[in-house]
């Protein structure tokens, strides 16, 4: 299945290096019931398209990929409409479907079946040529490496609170969050940062190595009372340094291009540049039953 993504990315971003691996796919699907939430389209023994849908409550999210050599066969529409039915059966009132920004074929398809574009996301990257500097933390804050036994519950709560004002954020309970993060084969507490103000967690990062072809900043957050004090820049510098010390020379992250926190501009100032882009499309669903 990773060959489908590699072929699609190469056709859309010929100058970008494609690095989606089987391990990346396993991590992305770690929280899914594969029988219920994923679909694979085959032509004989060859995978020509696949995707997944997930969600709770009124909003579900889908994504699908079709090998560029197989465009025009109705595979994308089959995946999209199947996910709509799955989401509606699960109680969804709306569904989001994300496609690569330059994928005109997928964008036309979604528009033709009733979707509208609602948001743009970017993957940003940086190549590290030298050891990143040690970050400077604002007065009164102290940074430490994540300790699962000591920090897990409070970290999850702080992350959930920090993302509460993010666009269309869906909170995850501690059990689900733990499965994705703490039970992952890529979990390395040395790549996580916990920033405290007194006894409270004010900010933090979750990073993983060997993800999408390099180090990856999965989560970077600052709780609202501590925003606008330079913590985000310090967190990013700390993430770069941890990943560098772990042997990574390329670092990536995903960002809402319209984030109210100004995250996109923060990452640009740190030297990161957009490598890939996705457009989120939305459709209202009719109730089933």
Show the residue positions of the predicted features.
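Active-site/acyl-donor-binding loops of N-acyltransferases
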Residues: 111-133, 237-238, 246-289
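Conserved acetyl-CoA-binding loop-helix of GNAT-fold acetyltransferases
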Residues: 72-85, 222, 228-245, 264-269
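Acyl-donor-binding surface of acyltransferase catalytic domains
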Residues: 47, 54-61, 66-141, 279-283
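A short, internal acetyl-CoA/4′-phosphopantetheine-binding micro-motif in the GNAT/acyltransferase core
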Residues: 40, 54, 63-73, 220-227, ...
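A conserved beta-strand-loop-helix scaffold within acyl/acetyltransferase catalytic domains
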Residues: 12-37, 51-58, 166-222
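Short amphipathic alpha-helix that is part of the acyltransferase structural core
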Residues: 1-26, 136-171
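Catalytic cores of nucleotide-enabled group-transfer and carboxylate-activating enzymes in metabolic
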Residues: 15, 21-25, 33-46, 88, ...
